């Protein structure tokens, strides 16, 4: 991907409101918050705020919105910069949902449509700058409390990336090359989102530069081709 094509892609994202600071107030909460996998269109009205999805998530990715979010108070969401969704086998969060807010027909990754990743400030990307991962950039992840082997595996992968060329967004993506891969821009590496991105948010979590966001409830075509 050359610089002209990259600028065209990011310009399209910015035009759709997903450039720097894309989290602007919207009229509908589902456009603001990243929901767990399988969230249905009318999630807001179906979620009974029971917290079952929160309890069963092995990565502790899901939280409940607080009073600051108004009518969304108590509904489940994912803060991708804190902890993305690792798209577990069998989707325990979906199976635990008693109200239908998370669609039980969600049984495989291809069923998931949480959103799509957006790279902003590409010139700050460590891969683009040809810089290694610095310990200070991943300290927040390494200091996270670990509760199980799955979380430990993520921590180990992050720890092993220190002082090496950065590709964490690509190497830890639970979808794989169909969602994100390293492309060339001006002869330098740069992560490129693809049609297979489901908006899980792992890339946003593990990015040392914190320059990846997730556009919730949006498709690849809406952001990059709209």
Task: Name each model feature, range by range.
Residues 1-190, 194-226:
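Non-ligating segments of multi-cofactor redox enzymes
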């Amino acid at each position: 991907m050359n610089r002209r094509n990259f600028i065209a892609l990011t310009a399209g994202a910015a035009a759709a409101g997903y450039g720097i600071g894309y989290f602007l107030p919207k009229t509908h909460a589902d456009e603001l918050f990243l929901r767990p996998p399988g969230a249905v269109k009318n999630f807001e009205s179906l979620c009974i705020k029971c917290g079952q999805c929160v309890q069963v998530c092995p990565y502790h990715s899901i939280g409940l919105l607080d009073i600051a979010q108004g009518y969304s108070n108590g509904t489940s969401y994912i803060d991708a910069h804190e902890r993305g969704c690792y798209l577990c086998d069998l989707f325990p969060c979906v199976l635990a949902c008693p109200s239908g807010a998370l669609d039980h027909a969600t049984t495989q990754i291809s069923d998931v449509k949480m959103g799509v990743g957006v790279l902003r400030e590409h010139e700050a990307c460590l891969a683009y700058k040809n810089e290694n991962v610095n310990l200070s950039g991943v300290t927040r992840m390494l200091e996270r409390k670990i509760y199980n082997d799955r979380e430990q595996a993520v921590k180990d992968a992050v720890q092993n990336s220190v002082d090496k060329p950065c590709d964490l967004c690509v190497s830890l993506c639970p979808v794989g090359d169909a969602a994100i891969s390293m492309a060339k821009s001006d002869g330098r590496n740069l992560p490129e989102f693809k049609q297979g991105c489901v908006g899980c948010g792992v890339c946003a979590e593990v990015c040392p530069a914190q320059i990846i966001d997730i556009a919730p409830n949006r498709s690849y075509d809406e952001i990059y081709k709209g």
